[in-house]
Amino acid sequence: GEVEFVATDCGASVVIASHDKAISIQGVKEKSEVRELIAFGEEALPAGMLSFNDLLAGNEDEFETVDVDTNSLSTIGYTSGTTGHPKGACLSHRNILLNVAMTALMHQRSDRDTVVTALPCPHVYGNVVMSGAIQTGMTLVLHPAFDEKTIMQSIQEHKATLFEGVPTMFMF
């Protein structure tokens, strides 16, 4: 499948996914170089899968910072593959930081903002929204899927100052 292709193409050794996605792709370990499959969530996991929450438990203050060359590879974003297999676009740490900073500046984001979104974080736009929330200190209300009624309730409940979405989300 697509995850297997991307994991093999980029040489991934670890895949981190939501519980549901991790369950649906657990065969990727047998078909690629992936050694670990890590899942978010509280649900029980099958043997051979690691819990993200368990990995962090008790270690919240033990992360060491590392020096990173801003021009080194940060992310490989994959195209949709409309003309064949998906193609990886290599982005440096500088690329990501500047994109996040410029988007925050253009959208006038600040730590006083609350953004509601259902954009998937692995998608480029979703990643920029998530990273922008981290950079500016704004509150991020992230929904696992787009449902117009749920989103509208969330905007009201959280007194959102921003909604981030793709054009089809604004047509409801």
Listing of model-derived features with the role each one plays in the protein:
Residues 15-26, 119, 144-149, 160-172:
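Adenylate-forming
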Residues 1-54:
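Structural core segment of the AMP-binding/adenylate-forming
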Residues 74-98:
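Conserved AMP-binding A3 loop
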Residues 39, 57-78, 85, 108-114:
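Conserved pre-ATP/AMP-binding loop-to-beta segment of ANL
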Residues 6, 15, 37, 137, ...:
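Residue-level signal for inorganic ion chemistry
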Residues 97-114, 122-162:
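Conserved AMP-binding/adenylation subdomain of ANL enzymes
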Residues 1-16, 88-90, 117, 139-145:
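Short beta-strand->loop structural element characteristic of the AMP-binding/adenylate-forming
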Residues 15, 73, 79-82, 115, ...:
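Conserved S/T- and glycine-rich ATP-binding loop of Class I adenylate-forming
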